[in-house]
Amino acid sequence: MAKEKARYFTFLLYPESIPSDWELKLETLGVPMAISPLHDKDKSSIKGQKYKKAHYHVLYIAKNPVTADSVRKKIKLLLGEKSLAMVQVVLNVENMYLYLTHESKDAIAKKKHVYDKADIKLINNFDIDRYVTLDVEEKTELFNVVVSLIRAYTLQNIFDLYDFIDENGETYGLTINLVNEVIAGKTGFMKLLFDGAYQRSKRGTKNEER
């Protein structure tokens, strides 16, 4: 998972573990980011503790596909070794943006405290509309890559596709999670693709036997 490449990431920052000029330092990276209001009213599940430790959520948009580990090292170099622990890949930018204020569906379902969206800080021209549109465009682009791979390597079923992604996904910027996301709702078309791959393979076998 550490080698999985992506463009969208999220991580937590704790006020006591970052320098006072942390926002200015983040700007120097030159990549778009959205920073949540300070989450200081998240209810804790620990007995005797009312709220979780106050923190910021950061939505980070890399210029090119990179690993979560490279983002983590870059932030630590900038803000300090103890500034963050984990960086996670974001599959849905819009949902993560809504989560910054606990307005995503899952946060609403869990009745989490809602923060004021006016307190979201945008760095380096972050524009949520642009990234939601990019999400749609990238899904189409990635689906076309999946189709091309099924054709080129005669992948006959979903397990063949998963095995191929496990071995070669990094080369094509694909992970099994991404594949699942881009093929969702395309069951009929995927069946046609796999049937076509099977028929082509069968035809090739017959030609070899002649």
Curated annotation (Swiss-Prot):
Any GO CC annotation of this UniProt entry: extrachromosomal circular DNA
GO biological process: DNA replication
Molecular function terms from GO: DNA binding; DNA topoisomerase activity; identical protein binding
InterPro entries, per the entry: Plasmid_rep_C_sf (IPR041919), Plasmid_rep_OBD (IPR002631)
Keyword Lipid biosynthesis: no
Pfam families: Rep_OBD (PF01719)
Keywords: DNA replication, Plasmid
Lineage top rank: taxon: Bacteria
Entry similarity comment: Belongs to the Gram-positive plasmids replication protein type 2 family.
Task of the protein: Is essential for plasmid replication. Nicks the positive strand at the plus origin of replication.
Protein's UniProt name: Replication protein RepB
UniProt source species: Streptococcus agalactiae
